[in-house]
Amino acid sequence: MPFKTLSRRTFLTASSALAFLHTPFARALPARQSVNINDYNPHDWIASFKQAFSEGQTVVVPAGFVCDNINTGIFIPPGKTLHILGSLRGNGRGRFVLQDGSQVTGGEGGGMHNITLDVRGSDCTIKGLAMSGFGPVMQIYIGGKNKRVMRNLTIDNLTVSHANYAILRQGFHNQIIGANITNCKFSDLQGDAIEWNVAINDSDILISDHVIERINCTNGKINWGIGIGLAGSTYDNNYPEDQAVKNFVVANITGSDCRQLIHVENGKHFVIRNINARNITPDFSKKAGIDNATVAIYGCDNFVIDNIEMINSAGMLIGYGVIKGKYLSIPQNFRVNNIQLDNTHLAYKLRGIQISAGNAVSFVSLTNIEMKRASLELHNKPQHLFMRNINVMQESSVGPALSMNFDMRKDVRGVFMAKKETLLSLANVHAVNERGQSSVDIDRINHHIVNVEKINFRLPERRE
């Protein structure tokens, strides 16, 4: 109604409404349950999202709708939700910051391109999104430099492709207690699908039920191109709790076409289980400086690796914690069970299973291992070594199927050898070449107790 036609009755009614807006009842009116972002100014999405979050509990980006040029930070208020059915796009500098109780959810067709989700609170949820874009270093960032405790993080059902890192956690300054990262598909990445870095304060972390495909770092970055990586801080052979990444499970992972699938540095109290790997070879991330292995463990204590199936892939590396050529720690106290590696149809030799283990009070248990056209290699000497139900075949032109290098007396790494109350226990262990002949190399046996049953090779005479 034009102002010049305003009647006295209309004017009085409007005046009464203005007075009502100043009453306590009016100020207490809650935000609407949901608002639609396409009802706001399309020429300034930053201001529009800020206004929308102030007016609604959930801000919806409708299907088929595109919000572009999101190139700065937007804070999602505590307890509020961004629900994406359309598309949000930026140039790599934009981010949505999640605070306590914030959620970013998606539906079919909902996605983000070149925008980062920055987690800075407890009880946050990121779910049901497609994410992509090489603009930002990572699609989801969890960390920051402020000291805080963040609890109950949920990341579920994401599809992340054609990006650098998918999920990056920098954990030195803060703590996460309880994180579930589940049911995602990661493909065509330059960086890691999940990197949980210097996460020495975190606990109760579950990373499970993911598909990882085609991770190939071609941009020259060092240490990029891992499927799932977790790391503590400085290696220490005493394995102090406050320097290790710990209390986590990595489970139900299907991975293919990358250089390294699972990676742990300076970790303890963890489980890796139910891994299915194909084509984990050196053809990927050739200049990234990372070892080729389905599972790579460096300087770790008290862990379990169980039910790993690998085909045409490099197997497992369990090795020293090394910095600048200095051997700082050796793996100890772990179980490796139910491992299958079949490289029968691979055109070239790859790592089978290489294990370095030791320390004065330590154990290693290797059980139910079957490998074809791959070698099992043991280096250094843990206090107690148990090997059960192991069948290994390697071609004679490559080397022995089973090698045990216990004698490290002339090696700088001999400092990690166990020397007191040592035990070697072997049962149902068979190592052969392609002709079915025994294929074993053992340098020296001087264990205090040796128990042997059903093996296809002779042990060297015991020497002090």
From Swiss-Prot:
Keywords: Lipopolysaccharide biosynthesis. It comes from the Bacteria. The keyword Chaperone does not apply. Transmembrane segments: none annotated. GO terms for biological process: lipopolysaccharide biosynthetic process; slime layer polysaccharide biosynthetic process. Pathway: Slime biogenesis; slime polysaccharide biosynthesis. This is Colanic acid biosynthesis protein WcaM. It comes from Shigella flexneri.
